[in-house]
Amino acid sequence: QTEGQSPQIGLPDDEFTDNHHLPYRLYVRQGRRIEGHETLNESDIHKDLRGNGLRGPLNANSVAIGVYGIDAHNVQGPTRSPEPPSGEGAAEGTLHLFDVTGPYQIPYGVMVPKSHQGILFPIGISSTHVAMCTVRMEPVWAALGQAAGVAAALSMNQGVELAQVPTASIQQEL
């Protein structure tokens, strides 16, 4: 399907080189993310860092809400550290922080790429690894997809680029 139309799209040359560049498992929690007009980070989802202790900070540009805790599986197998005594070490990158997040708001700008016009990314949003550990849930993606659809319709109706659609208009339609 990529021949002739999008030859730059394909499997990465440097990943899974021993398996014809195909992942061993279908389940992938995170993938590539855009660099957007805004970036969702840990302080945006954490109820204590900038929130009020019950929820993340308010964001006037929000178009979706998430509520799941920070949950990351290890990004690397066990290290070879001398601790614990078994010598196995800890799995690098494992985070299970369900008590630090409450409801948090996701701004429209995380779906709007800086480098391209005419496209929104409701799944591969502009976020840090830690923020994506909670955004990755299907209800959040559904809410972001709905917001993206509303933004696209407003962009067409108003004759403006997606980055210029007023967030208040998206919020009103949602």
Regions found by a protein language model. Give the residues of each.
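Flavin (FAD/FMN)-binding glycine-rich loop and adjacent Rossmann-like elements that form
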Residues: 1-174
